[in-house]
């Protein structure tokens, strides 16, 4: 009896050492915890196996079998964790399947480039270039003609300004001469009317008759 109790104590110490070398329960997210009932039943099975064998060697082999069984259980728990991790979808993949695709982004620069390319290809570029050259030549020639006309008008305007200034001076001189002549005529009329009244009146009548005849002929 004492030998059986000591062997059972040795088995418990060996199981405790083996159990302490296994990975922690907390590191396994989905591992099933070992309760006290499971531990007691496990101890009973070990004691029953050791009593039936009747030798220490057979007990050692049973303990090694138990250690291997625990390692297999741990591996199965790890496989189960991997299966659960693969089975649970990631948060990045939890997008709704009916979400609409925004589609490709509109490339403005590409659109402009394609439009210009089509316009160049559709038109005769050489003809357009020649037409542009002719138009530039016509514009340049007309610009030169306009410049010549402007220069001529400037010179002509200068001449007219000089003539106008000269004509203004001449008209002022003529006006002064006319005023002087009018004064002289008035002076002579006054003198003749006083000194020669009969001759003055006869001459005046002749002048008036001549004017009347000219008006009648017209």
Curated annotation (Swiss-Prot):
Superkingdom per UniProt: Eukaryota
Gene Ontology BP terms: endosome organization; regulation of protein localization
Primary residence: other
Keyword Electron transport attributed: no
Quaternary state and interactors: Component of the biogenesis of lysosome-related organelles complex-1 (BLOC-1) composed of at least BLI1, BLS1, CNL1, KXD1, SNN1 and VAB2.
Cited function: Component of the biogenesis of lysosome-related organelles complex-1 (BLOC-1) involved in endosomal cargo sorting.
Family to which this protein belongs: Belongs to the KXD1 family.
Designated name of the protein: Biogenesis of lysosome-related organelles complex 1 subunit KXD1
Species assigned in the record: Saccharomyces cerevisiae (strain ATCC 204508 / S288c) (Baker's yeast)
Gene name per UniProt: KXD1
């Amino acid at each position: 009896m004492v030998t059986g109790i000591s062997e059972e104590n040795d088995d418990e110490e060996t199981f405790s050492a083996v159990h302490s070398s296994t990975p922690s329960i907390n590191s396994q997210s989905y591992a099933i915890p070992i309760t006290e009932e499971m531990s007691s039943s496990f101890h009973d099975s070990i004691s029953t196996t050791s009593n039936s064998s009747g030798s220490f060697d057979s007990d050692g082999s049973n303990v090694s079998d138990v250690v291997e069984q625990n390692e297999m259980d741990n591996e199965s728990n790890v496989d189960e964790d991997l299966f659960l991790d693969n089975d649970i979808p990631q948060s990045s993949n939890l997008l709704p399947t009916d979400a609409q695709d925004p589609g490709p982004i509109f490339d403005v620069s590409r659109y402009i480039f394609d439009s210009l390319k089509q316009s160049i290809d559709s038109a005769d570029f050489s003809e357009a270039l020649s037409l542009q050259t002719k138009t530039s030549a016509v514009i340049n020639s007309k610009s030169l003609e306009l410049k010549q006309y402007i220069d001529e008008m400037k010179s002509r305007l200068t001449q007219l300004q000089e003539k106008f200034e000269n004509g203004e001076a001449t008209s002022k001189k003529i006006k002064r001469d006319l005023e002087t002549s009018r004064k002289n005529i008035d002076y002579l009329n006054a003198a003749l009317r006083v000194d020669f009244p009969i001759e003055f009146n006869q001459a005046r009548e002749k002048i008036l008759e001549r004017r009347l005849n000219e008006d009648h002929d017209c």
